[in-house]
């Protein structure tokens, strides 16, 4: 089945707990709220299990931007100690989102969505893409402006990659714009150039990508962004049991 039962997932958590794990767990799902009914059945079970053991785990997952429209879901996730969520924002350019058929990202202002999730005590991680068809010059700067405005600490960037057996691949193949075959298409978008002929010069896209990445992680700008972001985060409603720091934690502070 597409989703695990609450009983199965809680049993898996118990196995990790019995093995001595006490850190973060990433629930790997392209969209944790894709089946809202099942997610809302699961979350209270996780919360109860966590409460009984002093909240030994923190959770991270992936979700669509419309998580921001569901206050109940955000509250339930926070109460189960979901500390972070990865959003595929892709780009602040609405025309590019429409080209990519990511219509759920165009229904409401993206910066407001990030702020609502943040206010519920869930840290937003986000992915951004450069190189969409019809993209106007300056896309990299617009991503930097958006990340700076919202304060998102962890912003991943990549250049668009066409993957086999997708609508994008089929369209580009029909248009004769692919520059590599299926065997070479690995989907790595942070260290590779686009694997198709874009609608604007590839040199411009590559330069914007590098400049944007450097701007996002310039040390002073990054620290300012992280500081401003955590000032906006809602305080946790759960209370984890006190625990002694590990030697790894102590070495990190020295």
What are these regions (language model features)?
Residues 97-100, 168, 196:
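Short clusters of hydrophobic/aromatic residues that line enzyme substrate/ligand-binding pockets
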Residues 145-154:
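Basic phosphate/pyrophosphate-binding loop/patch that engages nucleotide-derived ligands
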Residues 82, 111-114, 144-145, 163, ...:
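Flexible glycine/proline-rich, aromatic-decorated loop/lid segments
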Residues 177, 181-184, 189-254:
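Radical SAM enzyme core and accessory elements
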Residues 155-161:
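Glycine-rich phosphate-binding active-site loops on the catalytic face of alpha/beta enzymes
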Residues 1-125, 130-145:
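Radical SAM [4Fe-4S] cluster-binding motif and immediate context
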């Amino acid at each position: 089945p597409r989703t695990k039962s609450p009983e199965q997932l809680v049993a898996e958590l118990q196995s990790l707990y019995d093995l001595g794990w006490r850190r973060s767990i990433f629930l790997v799902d392209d969209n944790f709220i894709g089946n809202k009914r099942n997610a809302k059945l699961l979350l209270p079970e996780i919360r109860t299990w966590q409460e009984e053991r002093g909240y030994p785990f923190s959770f991270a997952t992936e979700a669509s931007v419309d998580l921001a429209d569901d206050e109940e879901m955000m509250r339930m996730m926070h109460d189960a100690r979901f500390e972070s969520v990865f959003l595929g924002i892709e780009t602040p350019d609405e025309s590019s989102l429409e080209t990519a058929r990511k219509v759920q990202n165009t229904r409401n202002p993206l910066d407001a969505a990030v702020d609502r999730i943040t206010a519920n005590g869930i840290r937003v991680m986000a992915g951004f893409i450069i190189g969409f068809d019809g993209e106007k010059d300056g896309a990299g700067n617009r991503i930097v402006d958006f990340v700076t405005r919202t304060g998102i600490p962890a912003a991943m960037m990549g250049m668009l990659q066409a993957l086999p057996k997708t609508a994008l691949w089929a369209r580009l193949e029909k248009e004769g714009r692919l520059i590599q075959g299926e065997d070479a298409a690995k989907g790595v978008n942070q260290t590779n150039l686009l694997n198709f002929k874009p609608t604007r010069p590839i040199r411009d896209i590559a330069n914007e990508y590098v400049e944007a990445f450097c701007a996002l992680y310039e040390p002073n700008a990054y620290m300012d962004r992280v500081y401003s972001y955590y000032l906006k985060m809602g305080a946790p409603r759960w209370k984890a049991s006190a625990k002694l720091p590990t030697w790894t934690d102590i070495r990190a502070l020295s």
